[in-house]
């Protein structure tokens, strides 16, 4: 797919006026994965793991409905828009957890395929961090996709391996890499 370049993207807090159950109908969540990070013998290693990840329209609608539900209940969401079309989004949980630090979770963080590598993720991540600070957190907790590319993106944002693992989040996504960002 051709990359879309533009500088007139708008960034907004998500609400029922700008985000609905159909908002992700044109969203392209595609990733070709060739290698993933895995913890082997207590050490992180990059291992071959070839697959394609694609969100169907049905899954896009399920995720959109879930985002709508949570932004009305217990999360704050931010979106990047190209006109009326959402091209990236991030959500932050309002629940603070952790014993040694005060964490809030970055629940969703996605950029539509044709819009990646343009700074959209960096801007949405910054907005999510600002919200986490406002909520009183010390750190943002991220259960991050383990692919080589996803991990490179998180590390470029200065995310590091988590110091205090949330066992529930780790168990829910056992192949994710648990990461954090100090606010």
Predicted regions and their residues:
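Acetyl-CoA-dependent GNAT
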Residues: 18-19, 26-102, 107, 112, ...
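Conserved GNAT acetyl-CoA-binding A-motif
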Residues: 132-145
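Structural motif
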Residues: 135, 156-157
């Amino acid at each position: 797919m051709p990359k879309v370049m533009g500088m007139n993207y708008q960034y907004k807090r998500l609400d029922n006026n700008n985000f609905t159950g159909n908002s992700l109908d044109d969203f392209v969540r595609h990733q070709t994965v060739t290698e993933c990070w895995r913890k082997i013998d207590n050490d992180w290693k990059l291992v071959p793991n070839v697959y394609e990840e694609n969100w169907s329209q049905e899954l896009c609608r399920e995720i959109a409905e879930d985002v709508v539900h949570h932004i009305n209940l217990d999360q704050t969401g931010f979106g990047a828009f190209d006109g009326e079309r959402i091209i990236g989004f991030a959500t932050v949980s309002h629940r603070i957890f952790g014993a040694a630090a005060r964490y809030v979770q970055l629940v969703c963080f996605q950029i539509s395929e044709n819009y990646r590598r343009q700074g959209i993720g960096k801007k949405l991540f910054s907005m999510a961090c600002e919200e986490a600070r406002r909520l009183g957190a010390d750190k943002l907790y991220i259960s991050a996709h383990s692919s080589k590319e996803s991990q490179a993106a998180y590390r470029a944002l200065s995310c590091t391996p988590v110091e205090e693992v949330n066992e529930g989040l780790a168990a829910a996504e056992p192949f994710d890499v648990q990461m954090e960002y100090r606010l």
